[in-house]
């Protein structure tokens, strides 16, 4: 997933000899991080404490934790600004659930705070094997579209796990809706969902032009330079 991807990206940047990235962890529910986060939301807000004290469910606790942390996020921006001349990259690891970060008030505060001070790019990490089926691919593209629409920032679409499932066909589907339609026909699915996917492929054609798709593998390290150059 995304945390493994950030671990690989962090290791790749260290190996290249660039200045170590400044990593900010904004996932309050993660148990262990395989990298050193310079700023960690878990040091300020207890995810499980919120669940117990306020009777919240998992997603509610994550949203509340991010919202609370966002009230003092100017301090994080100040830390990054002080190190700006020394840093090449600031990497922010957010909660994986799109709805609890991208569409939360706290998530908006964080995104806008970074975008107002730094050149900011959103990375949407999609699972390449999970996108192998046309309808699953379309579901992922709709999610990416919603994130791009909300953030209004440049986006890199990283198809992860290409060592297990090459992303070449996914790029073909993005480049030519007729190829995507042929894949839908070959699947034999005549459901309403398949018909909707067919229509959406036409609607999203312009959206694809605003994405920078790359294939990566967090497991074996493929595509990291392509990702950084996207």
Q: Where are the regions that the model predicts?
A:
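Conserved glycine(s) of the Walker
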Residues: 1
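Conserved GTP-binding G-domain of TRAFAC-class P-loop NTPases and closely related GTPase folds
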Residues: 112-230
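Nucleotide-state-sensitive switch-loop elements of NTP-binding domains
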Residues: 4-121
């Amino acid at each position: 997933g995304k945390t493994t991807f950030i671990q690989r990206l962090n290791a790749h940047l260290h190996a290249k000899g660039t200045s170590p990235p400044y990593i900010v962890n904004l996932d309050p529910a993660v148990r262990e991080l395989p990298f050193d986060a310079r700023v960690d939301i878990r040091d300020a807000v207890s995810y499980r404490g919120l669940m117990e004290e306020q009777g919240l469910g998992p997603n509610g606790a994550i949203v509340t934790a991010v919202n609370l942390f966002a009230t003092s996020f100017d301090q994080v921006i100040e830390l990054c600004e002080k190190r700006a001349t020394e840093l090449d990259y600031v990497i922010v690891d957010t909660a994986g659930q799109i709805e609890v970060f991208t569409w939360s008030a706290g998530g908006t505060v964080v995104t806008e705070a970074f975008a107002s001070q730094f050149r900011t790019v959103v990375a949407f990490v999609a699972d390449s094997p999970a996108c192998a089926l046309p309808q699953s691919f379309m579901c992922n593209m709709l999610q990416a579209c919603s994130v791009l629409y909300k953030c209004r920032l440049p986006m890199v679409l990283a198809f992860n796990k290409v060592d297990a499932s090459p992303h070449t066909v996914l790029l073909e589907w993005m480049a030519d809706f007729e190829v995507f339609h042929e894949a839908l026909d070959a699947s034999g699915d005549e459901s309403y969902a398949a018909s909707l996917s067919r229509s959406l492929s036409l609607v999203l054609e312009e959206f694809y032009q605003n994405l920078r798709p790359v294939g990566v593998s967090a497991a074996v390290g493929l595509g990291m330079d392509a990702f950084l150059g996207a």
